[in-house]
From Swiss-Prot:
SUPFAM superfamilies: V-type ATP synthase subunit C. This is V-type proton ATPase subunit d 1. InterPro entries: ATPase_csu/dsu_sf, ATPase_V0-cplx_csu/dsu, ATPase_V0-cplx_dsu, V-type_ATPase_csu/dsu, V-type_ATPase_csu/dsu_dom_3. The gene is VhaAC39-1. Keywords: Hydrogen ion transport, Ion transport, Transport. It comes from Drosophila melanogaster (Fruit fly). V-ATPase is a heteromultimeric enzyme made up of two complexes: the ATP-hydrolytic V1 complex and the proton translocation V0 complex. The V1 complex consists of three catalytic AB heterodimers that form a heterohexamer, three peripheral stalks each consisting of EG heterodimers, one central rotor including subunits D and F, and the regulatory subunits C and H. The proton translocation complex V0 consists of the proton transport subunit a, a ring of proteolipid subunits c9c'', rotary subunit d, subunits e and f, and the accessory subunits VhaAC45 and ATP6AP2.
């Protein structure tokens, strides 16, 4: 072990070992082959008991529902993540906090949307992601105007730097809520990328690769989703995160694109993205571009575990488990609806 590894282990060795232990419990292909053969959700529960999920559904009464399975999967993952966060010291604690900011943005957008539509806060809070919860989250419901809402977000959340630089009070009233979400996410991704880059070493190597892909994926999806809408090319370009492999030339080309084929042409200049477009389609049996993006993300997250003494494993583990949760919920939906034709359309991890 080199000296940097020794120093890393003093503060972070236990948690990295714990995270790698959690990773060993991720479902293998053999587990999925068992799950897709289930006839009922009770069968599914039985098969999951034989994995690291154990008796996480033991206290749930029959008949089981997919939404209960979804909630319990998320609950288990949140407990694992929060356990690691509670035992972390700086700078790992800062890194883990950064991960939660993405969920916080989604929660803030949910609360802003609900507040502007006069929805009761008691109805909105349960829909928020627990990893993105923050102190005084319920205080936001006191805000009755966009200005009060804006100030509540600035005072009560760590997202203030992302808001101050790119969103004004007027924007909450006038700007499309999805534009606000993407503007915040651009600022967040760029800040997270710079944080990881400044850490240097294996953390920078692993995380900058993962976050660069996330930035490019968002730019591509924003472009495709903008076709046929009122969003101008200039406004669209302002939403692109500037920390991916497509920055700056690829993003400039994306900003000029008028249709899906032109986006595909831009992607062809980047080998890994060209492969994702080539392998996707909208015909029966084809994988969607979104599925191909998820597959590539899984590959990057699995690669993160090939190096030691870095923080990327914590991010990668969370993302792999989220994909696993989506897989289980997909299979559960197919079983519950007796719609087996597409039951194999999950994203394998190992």
């Amino acid at each position: 072990m080199n000296s940097s590894g020794f120093m890393f282990n003093i503060d972070n060795g236990y948690l990295e070992g714990l995270c790698r232990g959690f990773k060993c419990g991720i479902l293998k292909q053999a587990d999925y082959l068992n799950l897709v053969q289930c006839e009922t959700l009770e069968d599914l529960k039985l098969h999951l008991q034989g994995t690291d999920y154990g008796s996480f559904l033991a206290n749930e009464p029959s008949p089981l529902s997919v939404s209960v399975i979804d909630d319990k999967l998320r609950e288990k993952l949140v407990i694992e993540f929060q356990h690691m966060r509670n035992h972390a010291v700086e700078p790992l604690s800062n890194f883990l906090d950064f991960i939660t900011y993405g969920y916080m943005i989604d929660n803030i957008i949910l609360l802003i949307t609900g507040t502007l539509h006069q929805r009761p806060i008691s109805e909105l809070i349960p829909k928020c992601h627990p990893l993105g919860s923050f102190e005084q989250m319920e205080a936001i419901h006191v805000a009755s105007t966009p200005a009060e809402l804006y100030n509540a977000v600035l005072v009560d959340t760590p997202l203030a730097p992302f808001f101050v630089d790119c969103i004004s009070e007027q924007d909450l009233d006038e700007m499309n809520i999805e534009i606000i979400r993407n503007t915040l996410y651009k600022a967040y991704l760029e800040a997270f990328y710079n944080f990881c880059k400044n850490m240097g070493g294996a953390t920078a190597d692993v995380m900058c690769e993962i976050l660069a892909f996330e930035a490019d994926r968002r730019a591509i999806i924003i472009t495709i989703n903008s076709f046929g809408t009122e969003l101008s090319k200039d406004d669209r370009a302002k939403l692109y995160p500037n920390c991916g492999k497509m920055y700056p030339d690829g993003l400039a080309a994306l900003a000029r694109a008028d249709d899906y084929e032109q986006v595909k042409t831009v992607a062809e200049y980047y080998a890994e993205y060209a492969a994702l477009f080539d392998g996707s389609g909208n015909n029966p049996g084809d994988k969607t571009l979104e599925d191909k993006f998820f597959e590539h993300e899984v590959k990057l997250d699995v690669y993160a575990f090939l190096q030691q003494f870095h923080f990327g494993v914590f991010y990668a583990y969370l993302k792999l488990k989220e994909q696993e949760c989506r897989n289980i919920v997909w299979i559960a939906e197919c079983v519950a609806q007796k719609h087996r034709a597409k039951i194999d359309n999950y994203i394998p991890i190992f």
